[in-house]
């Protein structure tokens, strides 16, 4: 009887430990050695270049492509922010089909569209950065619904039941909430994730990238911190991934919090110093000087149907010549670009793609050429959006080395 009692206590204790562990996110660390062992295991074959500043066909020219999506009928939607429209193409032939939207603030108009996402029924949600609204279009371009929002929508994901997962950068900074889940009537159902924990360490207004998988899990990555997080559809942090770099970066500590349900990011606060000098007239001029080492993270992320995680990261630091090869200046109707060297900006090789298993371990790597502002994965196709610098979308065929 005594042995049965001891056995029962042991089982109960194990169950308690298991339940506690179930609430804790898994932190997976990938070293530089792990990454180097996977070099070249992702094969990328360039299939087509969409757009580019040398494109002469007005229907195929983009001012600032921001993101793409492919529907079940093989139509490719390319969101062109500063042309204030969505251009639609046949993905196989490359032929132009139609344009959704034009500059304006009325129904079926668009004002600086930043992000798009397709519903299960084939409609298109568009987040208007300058319009402070999200708008639902039919595939033919008819406006079906408009929802006003308080902040600029910078990323939209559609769940399996057609709810919307939306990232508002200003809202995230002000509230600490990462993603808002809306129903189709524009009501906030819940929030998912935290922007960062300011009580532990203040992080400046850094940008993030997002993706959503076919189970409605949401992934986020910081552009200047080597951390990718995966949340369940109800907001539980399931996985956190870190990765090393082949050059010295700013020291950052990434650790689970006390409960294990979130990740704390700890780094030095004194990243800049103020230098005051006087000009010839004796007027004091203040200049901010950055003292820290480079800050790097995953600029862009994407998810395939097997829930493998793709992240665009920096492989090496740019040279001084590369840093000044191209410049961009914002304007109301687009970006003005100046290029000192076309070959550098079109073929720069400082970026690579890392692929992680659903469990968070790195499994493949590939070098890419050019810049990448966002990515989209459909089957064995990888679309890299190089919009800010080269005004184009690169379409690759993917395969993995066994």
Label the model's feature ranges.
Residues 1-8:
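Bacterial N-terminal signal peptides that target proteins for export
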Residues 21-402:
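Eukaryotic scaffold repeat domains enriched in small/polar residues
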